[in-house]
């Protein structure tokens, strides 16, 4: 998963078209014989149209009950992230958030709390 901030420090989240349509950090599955960083770059390009400039490991979220490990990378992109976006087959919407929406994935909640312990977890009321 990618932690991408804009100039204001807001974090990029995507809302998927399939499943429960929850907000999450950009990212996806690693293909056979693909490195973690290559998979991350491919997924970010596919989901957001942004091109990755640099990737730095941040932390890991182990989910043994699901048999999954999710890895978080801090990502900088080749151009400043903007709010201009066109939906894709996988992604219904995206946006930069200063608060984590209540309808977010467990992994997004885990990483948000770890990366932004002082930031709000819910939209303003």
Model-derived segments and spans:
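Conserved positions in beta-strands of structured domains
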Residues: 5, 58-59
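Nudix hydrolase/Nudix homology domain
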Residues: 20-23, 88-125
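Conserved N-terminal beta-strand and adjoining loop/helix that marks the start
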Residues: 1-11
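A short beta-turn/loop motif at secondary-structure boundaries
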Residues: 17, 61-65, 88-89
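Active-site-adjacent beta-strand/loop module that shapes the phosphate/pyrophosphate-binding cleft
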Residues: 61-83, 95-99, 109-116
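Short strand-connecting beta-turns/loops that link adjacent beta-strands
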Residues: 7-9, 18-19, 65-66
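The catalytic Nudix box helix
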Residues: 25-57
């Amino acid at each position: 998963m990618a932690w991408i901030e804009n100039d204001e420090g807001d974090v990029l989240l995507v809302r998927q078209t399939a499943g429960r349509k929850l907000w999450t950090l950009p990212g996806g599955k690693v293909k056979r014989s693909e490195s973690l960083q290559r998979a991350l770059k491919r997924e970010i390009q596919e989901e957001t149209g942004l091109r990755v400039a640099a990737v730095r490991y941040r932390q890991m979220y182990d989910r043994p009950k699901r048999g999954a490990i999710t890895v978080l990378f801090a990502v900088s992109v080749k151009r400043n992230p903007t709010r201009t976006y066109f939906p894709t087959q996988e992604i219904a919407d995206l946006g930069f958030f200063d608060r984590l929406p209540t309808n977010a994935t467990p992994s997004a909640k885990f990483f948000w709390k770890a990366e932004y312990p002082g930031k709000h977890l819910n939209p303003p009321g």
